[in-house]
Amino acid sequence: MVEWTDFERATIKDVFSKIEYEVVGPAALARCLVVYPWTQRYFGNFGNLYNAAAITGNPKVAKHGITILHGLDKAVKNMDDIRNTYAELSVLHSEKLHVDPDNFKLLADCLTIVVAAQMGKAFTGEIQAAFQKFLAVVVSSLGRQYH
C-alpha cells in the first residue's frame, strides 16, 4: 500500500485539474510513439504511423491519448486503491493485448514531459516528485498482472 502525504494528494488533484486532456493526452501518446517507435506495434489498427507528422495528426492517436488521461482520472479518484482500480485493465493489457509492461513507464515519462511543458515554471521539483510517484504507482498497477 502506498502512503500519500496531504501535499501529494493535493498536488495530483491540482495537476489533473489543470491538464488540458484534449492537448496533453494526444501529445503524450504521440511523443511516445515517435520517441519509442517500437511501441507502435500495439496500434496497428490506427493507420498511418509512418512519421512524426502522421502520428501527431492521426485522429486515432489523439482519441486514445484522451482516453488514457480519462483512465488516469480513475487513479486520481482512487489513490488509496490504484492497484485494484486497474486490475481489469492490467489483465486486458497483459493477456489480450500482450503489451510489454515497460511501455507503461515510457508513456508515463512522455506524459511527464508534456505536463511539464504545459505547466512551465509551475512544475517544480516537488510537484514533479509527486506526479512521478503517482505515475509509478499507476505503472506498477498496470504491470501487476505480469508478475
UniProtKB/Swiss-Prot annotation:
CDD domains: Hb-beta-like. InterPro entries: Globin, Globin-like_sf, Globin/Proto, Hemoglobin_b, Hemoglobin_oxygen_transport. Involved in oxygen transport from gills to the various peripheral tissues. Keywords: Heme, Iron, Metal-binding, Oxygen transport, Transport. Red blood cells. GO terms for cellular component: blood microparticle; haptoglobin-hemoglobin complex; hemoglobin complex. GO terms for biological process: hydrogen peroxide catabolic process. It comes from Cottoperca gobio. This fish has two hemoglobins: Hb1 and Hb2. They display the Bohr and root effects. Belongs to the globin family. Hb 1 is a heterotetramer of two alpha-1 and two beta chains. Hb 2 is a heterotetramer of two alpha-2 and two beta chains. Heme b binds at residues 64, 93. GO terms for molecular function: haptoglobin binding; heme binding; metal ion binding; organic acid binding; oxygen binding; oxygen carrier activity; peroxidase activity. This is Hemoglobin subunit beta. SUPFAM superfamilies: Globin-like. Residues 3-147 form the Globin domain.
